Design a protein with these regions (language model features):
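N-terminal FAD-binding dinucleotide-binding subdomain shared by FAD-dependent oxidases/monooxygenases
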Residues: 1-248
Length: 248
């Protein structure tokens, strides 16, 4: 969002963030005619904690006669029925029912592969208390396994294409180094993993990302998933760190 990029303190100043949230609420209420509906559509979290819907026609849709908004905080879904679903207050009939239930971000796809490490642990077991790795790239006990834009790297909080390219370049340079020096295996140390995860979370705790908002950045949308802030905040500083390591 160009709007978000125009200010450098939205992620660290609650006052500045609240001003931005008020602006967003105002814009939504200008588009949605029914103010009670508009109020329900206004995000109740800090800006950036969860992604905004910035589609040009999304909010206009709620002005149509054949569209209604049901707040499941007020009317929890009870059951799926033969013709639709029922809430605590009413039954709704549909031609189609789309289940937008979210996704297991950053770790789910990797854990579904059931990767076996060299120390009898699977990746699921290694990450049982949250993703543990070094630079978001490599894990102890999993030699020559590299993750691209995974947890512990800027990934979803940066330009993803640029982040992918930086990771591929880093891994490629490492593989060339290994070949030139006759190395067959490479993995992070356990302590390097611990220190890196502490650094990732230490940076996040200085921002509003961890100020009580239950987002998928924390894995809060998945029941039972450890609540740990997964992305590294700050692409330039991350690249600088990777460059320092490569030059060492």
């Amino acid at each position: 969002l160009p709007f978000a990029a125009s200010f450098n303190d939205l992620g660290i100043s609650q006052e500045a963030n609240s001003t931005a949230v008020d602006f967003i609420h105002q814009k939504i209420k200008q588009v949605v005619k029914d103010q009670s509906v508009a109020e329900k559509l206004c995000p109740k979290t800090t800006m950036g904690c969860k992604r905004l819907c910035v589609d040009s026609d999304y909010y206009k849709t709620f002005n149509r006669d054949n569209v209604s908004l049901v707040d499941i905080n007020e009317q929890p879904i009870k059951t799926i029925t033969e013709h639709g679903l029922s809430t605590a207050n009413a039954e709704y009939r549909f031609d189609s029912l789309i289940l937008a239930t979210g996704f297991d971000a950053m770790t789910g796809a990797l854990l579904d592969i059931k990767i076996q490490g060299s120390k009898t642990l699977t990746l699921s077991e290694h990450w049982a208390e949250g993703p543990l790795n070094y630079l978001g790239l490599m894990m102890n006990g999993f030699p020559n396994l590299f993750t691209i834009t995974g947890p512990g790297s800027p990934s979803v909080l940066s330009n993803m294409i640029v982040a992918i390219e930086q990771h591929v370049d880093f891994i490629s340079d490492l593989l060339i180094f290994m070949r030139q020096n006759g190395k067959r295996n490479f993995e992070a140390t356990r302590q390097a993993e611990i220190d890196w995860v502490q650094q990732v979370n230490g940076i996040a705790e200085q921002t509003l990302y961890t100020s009580g908002c239950n987002s998928w950045y924390l894995g809060a949308n998945i029941p039972g998933k450890p609540k740990i802030f997964m992305p590294y905040i700050g692409y330039p500083s991350y690249v600088e760190k990777c460059d320092e390591i490569a030059a060492d």
